[in-house]
């Protein structure tokens, strides 16, 4: 039998890691569903496996061995820490393993402003995974993989599934909170004195626009999105809500704001949306976008996330992430004269601010 070299073993390990890559996502989902982070956080001190099993919000008795093995994996993934505590009991040293939150686990606690729980539950979902299983079919045409897998577009799916729509809105709200914190604190010049009116196209439940309105009270803000999204958005005194279809009409303003909208669409659809924006932006106004910008050489720390998001867009709605050159080509086709790219440095630093004139 041929001896496997060290290099072959290393290369095989790479393939095995890819084969079992799903385990990271699904064990993360399991941790969120079982509320492991909240349980330990609320307890206030490290917990033994028996203490954790007794406090988890699970109706049936917990299998201690299986919970231990799940926690062992999550510790390996650096989501939780394990502490070995020695105590003296009647002359005998007793050793107990206890679990505590590692720094990333704070994002797995429901209810906090930093919570990424909606993103975990929204992305790592059986229906959301279904299109990925037929990814091969996307290589032979222009079919919408999500529609092929689930029989309907993602927008129709969300409108028919209120719970998933709410989770999706929660995920977008988290992202919006990170992005707008950077926008209003570090990039105030983007919202210059010349901007008196602003429309957030595809603004979801208004998280981003609420922050913009608070930071710049002189700007009259309008939230614009599909009817089922607007219906799920809270009433905000300083913001006007308008429902509609951006392919048909967009309210006019000095500035149009769009966060993670165009990556949902193919090039022709993007050009249609951009032309609508150009038609309604006041003279001297601009389009303000927050989008990922792919780097050609993939050397950025967020390159893998950006590339993964690109495939996610292809799978779920036929969209894509784009390079600077690809963005510039779209802006030119829509009749815009110039643009400016600014890489975000805090918050969700995988994204960029794009100003289009």
UniProtKB/Swiss-Prot annotation:
pH dependence: Optimum pH is between 7.0 and 9.5.
SUPFAM superfamilies: S-adenosyl-L-methionine-dependent methyltransferases, Winged helix' DNA-binding domain
Top-level taxon of origin: Eukaryota
InterPro entries for this protein: COMT-like, O_MeTrfase_dom, Plant_O-MeTrfase_dimerisation, SAM-dependent_MTases_sf, WH-like_DNA-bd_sf, WH_DNA-bd_sf
Active-site residues, record numbering mapped to chain: 263
Keywords of this entry: Alkaloid metabolism, Methyltransferase, S-adenosyl-L-methionine, Transferase
Residues binding S-adenosyl-L-methionine, per UniProt: 225
Keyword Manganese: no
Example GO BP: methylation
Enzyme nomenclature, EC number: 2.1.1.-
Tissue distribution of the protein: Expressed instems, leaves, roots and seedlings.
PROSITE patterns reported for this sequence: SAM_OMT_II
Thermal activity characteristics from the UniProt entry: Optimum temperature is 35 degrees Celsius.
Example GO molecular function: O-methyltransferase activity
Short name of one Pfam family: Dimerisation
Family per similarity comment: Belongs to the class I-like SAM-binding methyltransferase superfamily. Cation-independent O-methyltransferase family.
Function (record text): Involved in the biosynthesis of benzylisoquinoline alkaloids. Catalyzes specifically the methylation of norreticuline at position seven to produce norlaudanine. No activity with norcoclaurine, reticuline, norlaudanosoline, norisoorientaline, scoulerine, salutaridinol, oripavine, salsolinol, codeine or morphine. Involved in papaverine biosynthesis.
Listed name of the protein: Norreticuline-7-O-methyltransferase
Organism name: Papaver somniferum
